[in-house]
């Protein structure tokens, strides 16, 4: 899996947590999130810890650092522009209320729409493809179709090429 895919998956995971339990301080929440990701990866490599065992985290790997560098601006941007992004979702999600949508799908959409609207260095078709794959991985097979349908409508409204970087 590429670093950018991994970063997007982590971004969706953080946005999901943020959506369901907004932290008082986003910076602290991000630091805790990245530490928990590293702890989970270490436990996967090392095996389960015993009670009372203290685990000292090694420095982040180059791949972990690259994922964080790519993901954090996406996370912060999606949070900063959430109201506008949610309006796009409401406009195109016919017969769906935002709060009734699966939380995973809602946050996959938020991330992808942020990329499509504000990240001209990422072609919209890349954002759509990544969002569909992440929705299928973390939600349901039907989520991929749902996410694709909404994002395709938004792509049609963009004032930039779908396959090119500006």
Q: Where do the model's predicted regions map?
A:
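N-terminal interaction/assembly modules
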Residues: 1-166
């Amino acid at each position: 899996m590429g670093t950018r895919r991994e970063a997007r998956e982590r971004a969706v995971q953080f946005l999901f947590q943020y959506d369901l339990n907004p932290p008082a301080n986003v910076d602290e929440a991000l630091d805790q999130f990245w530490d928990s990701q590293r702890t989970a990866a270490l436990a996967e490599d090392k095996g389960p810890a015993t009670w009372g065992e203290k685990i000292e985290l090694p420095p982040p790997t180059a791949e972990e650092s690259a994922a964080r560098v790519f993901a954090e601006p996406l996370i912060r941007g999606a949070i900063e522009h959430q109201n506008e992004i949610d309006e796009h979702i409401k406009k195109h999600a016919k017969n769906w209320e935002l709060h009734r949508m699966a939380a995973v799908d809602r946050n996959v959409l938020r991330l992808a729409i942020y990329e499509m609207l504000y990240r001209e260095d990422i072609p919209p078709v890349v954002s759509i493809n990544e969002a569909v794959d992440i929705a299928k991985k973390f939600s349901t097979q039907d989520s991929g179709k749902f996410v694709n349908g909404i994002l395709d409508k938004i792509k049609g409204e963009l004032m930039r090429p779908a396959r090119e970087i500006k």
